[in-house]
Amino acid sequence: MSDFENKIEELGGKAKEAVGEATENEQLADEGRADQTKADVKQAVSDAGDKIKGAADKVLGSFQKDEEN
């Protein structure tokens, strides 16, 4: 899932939470908070994957430099 899709899910959750609170519908508010948490977790996993990929690319790059020498 892309950063954009995660942000859309988070914003949807905020909207759902706000509507739930405005209408005193606690179930809807809880669903909104859950949607936000889910989006935050997906974003954290995506960010961690990006960092791992960056580190792996750096390691592979250093091996390639060693092979050239």
Swiss-Prot record:
Residues 1-19, 30-41 have a biased composition (Basic and acidic residues). It comes from Corynebacterium diphtheriae (strain ATCC 700971 / NCTC 13129 / Biotype gravis). This is UPF0337 protein DIP1660. Disulfide bonds: none annotated. Residues 1-42 are annotated as: Disordered. Belongs to the UPF0337 (CsbD) family. SUPFAM superfamilies: Hypothetical protein YjbJ. Pfam families: CsbD.
